[in-house]
Amino acid sequence: MKKIGFLSFGHWQPVPGSLTRTAQDALLQSIDLAVAAEEIGIDGAFVRVHHFARQLASPYPLLAAMAARTKTIELGTGVIDMRYENGFYAAEEAAATDLISGGRLQLGVSRGSPETALNGSESFGYVPADGQTDADLAREHTADFLRGLEGHGIAPANPQATGTRALLPLTPQSPGLRQRIWWGSGTRGTATWTAEQGMNLMSSTLLTEDTGVPFGDLQAEQIQLFRDVWATAGWDWEPRVSVSRSILPITTDQDRAYFGNLATRERQDQVGYIDNSIARFGKSYVGEPDKIVEELLGDAAVMAADTLLVTVPNQLGVDYNAHLLETIARDIRPALQ
């Protein structure tokens, strides 16, 4: 059965129409939306992570608070920018949060997306070595993160304090968390690397490459390549694959007021540039639920993935986003199974 989750960008700004005017609004409403989503029957509550922006930057306190208010819904990120992370400390935070949640974390990590800061991770003390790219830095931090989660010895013990010279692992450890780490992949090449590293695949609403084929088909190629490489990599467990889509069903006058006149260009794939590289962006799915179902059934990547993350307009508030999720769960989800 395909899992459905929401993905919140956590925007907050004191502008007309925004119900998340402060960072506190965005944080508390993220918690409330996770509670509402669980009551509706949505499978996952995921948040984006961005630094130096009016968005969510520190995921672990938020995820822990969401965990304390819920019982069954998966809780995750899409994605944590590993350029900014100390891999070992991130592993400690992730394990503690996962224990609080009862093993419900699904953490997406990656190199991160284009940002407002120029080389922002360097201000956190993480500077690429000579000849190293920021993508290399993110992968290096991720390797430490995975080692920590796997329970490897990290630091030599002080024999005077411990009576041993063994390497000490990080604590706490949370069983099974290592298999619930996802890599946010924007190309077919990084999908291959993700499979080799033994991480689940998280594919977003864009790919940083374009071959001229529709976005869903290109993303489906990425998913199949990931699964093909996984099958030969020797892992003894089955990975998961998620894709993200903007889905805005119109069933009420309020829906129509918000999205009825959405620009036509957002209802089709777009091609542009990110970080001086060509990229293909997926379209928004807007309209009557039956129309959206028909379009999603024709989206090869949506049908290939086992998890669909729906991006939500978080600044419209908890009640409205709960309404959107309820419509998706009731009128769209059954047809996708």
PLM feature spans:
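Flexible, glycine-rich active-site loops centered on histidine and acidic residues
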Residues: 2-23, 84-154, 209
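Active-site mouth loops of central-metabolism enzymes
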Residues: 13-27, 80-87, 177-185, 280-289
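Glycine-rich, proline-tolerant flexible connector loops at the mouths of alpha/beta enzymes
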Residues: 44-66, 81, 205-216, 311-320
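An alpha-helical appendage that flanks or caps ligand/catalytic pockets
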Residues: 130-170, 203-204, 211-305
